[in-house]
Amino acid sequence: MEFIYKYAWIVPFLPLSASVPIGLGSLFFPGATKSVRRTWALISIFLLSVAMFLSFNLFLQQITGGPIYRYFWSWVINNKFSLELGYLIDPLTSIMLVLVTTVGTMVMIYSDNYMSHDKTYVRFFAYLNFFNASMLGLVISPNLLQIYIFWELVGMCSYLLIGFWFTRPSAANACQKAFITNRAGDFGLLLGILGFYWVTGSFEFQYLSEKLNELTAIDGVGSFFVTSCAFLLFLGPVAKSAQFPLHVWLPDAMEGPTPISALIHAATMVAAGIFLVARLFPLFKALPLIMYLISWIGGITALLGATMALAQKDLKRGLAYSTMSQLGYMMLALGIDSYRIALFHLITHAYSKALLFLGSGSVIHSMEPIVGYCPRKSQNMALMGGLRKYMPITGITFLLGTLSLSGIPPFACFWSKDQILSDSKLYSPIFGGITWFTAGLTAFYMFRMYLLTFEGDFRVNLVNSYNNHITLYSTSMWGEEESRILNRTRADSMSNQIIGRNNSFSKEAFQISNKMEGLYKKNRGLVVTYPFFYKGSFAYPKESGKAMLFPLVVLGIFTLFVGLIGVPFFRSGMRYDILSQWFASSTAPFDKKHPENWSEFFIDAIPSVGIAFLGILIACILYRPIYFLSQDVYHKTNPHMKIIMDQSINIIYNWSFYQAYIDIYYDIILIKGIRGLAETSHSFDQWAIDGIPNGVGFLGLFVGEGMRCLGGGRISSYIFFSLFCVLISILIYYYSFSFYP
């Protein structure tokens, strides 16, 4: 056992040992490195798999009662200052090591096929290995200073991968946006670290918390200063985990390759913020005001992310807002002192979200040969539909992830989300209402994405048919039960009609064209319209390769069974679960009422499952493949009520589609404000700061030139100067006698 702990540093070193030679080879021997690129990929997968094996070994040692292990070596030593580096192995570290290495290995296997067509394949694996190494280094860090070093390395890798296709302007802008947004949080994190070091004289987690509690007990430090330092420290996780109001970078981060989106959203960058709050939980717990702030930031983020996911047409952006919402759940759980449940949801969400992102990558990979390699088309759900028939394994695994994130038992996220809903309700009715409403929205938008992507007919054929001047009806992204005669001449216009951006909720009756090659029938006042089917020759997507399907199947299995670690077991009237045994040291601020038997547990779970099914039902009504419309009922609808409903729904739609207008506010207040301030500062510097010395210099130049001309030895100049002086004297004499007679 001692041997395993002693060499735990090898875990982050293994992916680093693959990243460095790949990167150096790409710089100095690009041709030779690219010629054996598959070999480098296999080496990367093998080394990370070894790291995963070691992580499981450390994990088993911890959950079977192994001791917490700390190892330090001194880097800088003098009389007043010492700096130690090392690693820390405890239950939190071991769980995160397993999480990062398992998801990272699956992403690497997946990327080998997904990125095979890309000429920057080698550079991608160099970044990917370094990304995994940085996150693993962050996880095992024993002090704040070492965490900050790896925190910045994780950020740097994420910026490199978000802007991986930097020749694309949108990717370059997304990279800059992520960098600038995270600068605000990271600067606060650095100030908070330095502030706590000034107070306690240490960067180590355990000593930091103990010393702070001692100083607080004897009033040795001001509460305002400590709270301010904790707030600055919390800014780092707010930015890194995309919490309100520093969340704006996360949706734009979808410009990176899809495997990176899976890694960022599941196990690395956004998980780093939650991990840091969990690591510093004893410190934050001693400050009630900060805990209250953490809970409110989490609650607002959860609700805001869910509302902004409702109207997204881009598959990956919809999943990005879903991640933002789920991270809000975790932060809320930490804020209400549900430490174990927050980490439980971090684990279940990681595997479910990795599955969903890799599934979306499989869809995009199959759509690109048909619609082109532009993200606006290959990721546009308006051009998808019916993919389950052509990609059954991808469709089934995506459905598993959708059910899990929606909170449907027995999938992973149900067990963790249900406990968050229960604890938040016990803590505060306001937080209970936020989490329950968000749970319903989550089920709605997740099934909306699934139905638009995998059910119905393949809608690219509608665009192709339209380009051949065949009249079609549009399929609204909001389940709009209408048909329009499309008379535009571009496929993009067709896509805009499919999205239904302007009149997304109108309930006009179907105007079925005589030229439409569809089927319809009337039955009891209902019009049943079957999806359009064109008999011509069209291209259809096909299932991805085995290298991409294998990670989907493995993550699907994790999604089915990983929730068992938090499932309660009742014995002798007591409640047990595996995860609680791993985090036996965590305490609660008050006695939370937990169910005492299975029947009580299921009764408590009924409302959360019910609201999830309600969201799914609404999504199925709006986005089902076959559309039903009662014409008689619709025509009898009160027109005033219809106008009010349409206006209300359009407000909700615009709020969601334009991301709650937050980006617009930031553009007006921050970006344009800073640019205006910079222009004003530049003008002041140019005309005032530089203008005064430059003006004096120019004045001296002109005076000197004038004196040079006067003293040049020319008689005409002397005469002119003499006459000029006489004239000035006469004028002065005349005006002086005029004013003073």
Swiss-Prot record:
It catalyses: a plastoquinone + NADH + (n+1) H(+)(in) = a plastoquinol + NAD(+) + n H(+)(out); a plastoquinone + NADPH + (n+1) H(+)(in) = a plastoquinol + NADP(+) + n H(+)(out). Its EC number is 7.1.1.-. InterPro entries: NADH_UbQ_OxRdtase_chlpt_su5_C (IPR002128), NADHpl_OxRdtase_5_subgr (IPR018393), ND/Mrp_TM (IPR001750), NU5C-like (IPR003945), Proton_antipo_N (IPR001516). One of its GO terms (biological process) is electron transport coupled proton transport. This is NAD(P)H-quinone oxidoreductase subunit 5, chloroplastic. It comes from the Eukaryota. NDH shuttles electrons from NAD(P)H:plastoquinone, via FMN and iron-sulfur (Fe-S) centers, to quinones in the photosynthetic chain and possibly in a chloroplast respiratory chain. The immediate electron acceptor for the enzyme in this species is believed to be plastoquinone. Couples the redox reaction to proton translocation, and thus conserves the redox energy in a proton gradient. Keywords: Chloroplast, Membrane, NAD, NADP, Plastid, Plastoquinone, Quinone, Thylakoid, Translocase, Transmembrane, Transmembrane helix, Transport. It comes from Cryptomeria japonica (Japanese cedar). NCBIfam families: NDH_I_L, PRK06590.1. It is found in: Plastid, Chloroplast thylakoid membrane. Its main location: plastid. One of its GO terms (molecular function) is quinone binding. GO terms for cellular component: chloroplast thylakoid membrane. NDH is composed of at least 16 different subunits, 5 of which are encoded in the nucleus. It is a multi-pass membrane protein. The keyword Chloroplast applies. The chain crosses the membrane at residues 9-29, 40-60, 89-109, 124-144, 147-167, 185-205, 218-238, 258-278, 286-306, 327-347, 354-374, 395-415, 427-447, 550-570, 601-621, 651-671, 687-707, 719-739. Belongs to the complex I subunit 5 family. The keyword Plastid applies. It is an enzyme of class 7 (translocase).
